[in-house]
Amino acid sequence: MTEKKPIRTLLCIAVLQNFFDLPFDQTGPVWTATKQFLAAVHKMPGVTVLGTIDDDETMVGTSPTGFPWTCYLLGDFPDREAVVAACNLFRTIEVGDQGHRLWRYMRIEARMGRPLPTPEL
């Protein structure tokens, strides 16, 4: 039997206008929920998180629709269902005590594929 290869996945996360409309002293719960999301993905069975990046330093190249993405998580997921489950966390993680979910303040997109071969140097 052939061993099932993990799916290399890039989770792209964008901060929505609802976050920017919050008074500064009310943004903390969104960051707390974001950390909860990251921790949950790290703990998912069969998921290996390879790295994260917040692109608030510099972006090089064109972005025809502005700056849609804010941060990224690159990981190997055991299957498509695990990727869907990770994205679904935005629907279930609560932000603060107002009954809002993380997806009110951020959106997520998953890009699934395979690693490129590493060139021999």
What are these regions (language model features)?
Residues 24, 86, 94-96:
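A generic "cationic amphipathic patch" detector
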Residues 79-89:
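Short amphipathic alpha-helices within nucleic acid-binding modules
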Residues 91-103:
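A common structural junction motif
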Residues 104-112:
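Conserved catalytic core of two-metal-ion nucleotidyltransferases
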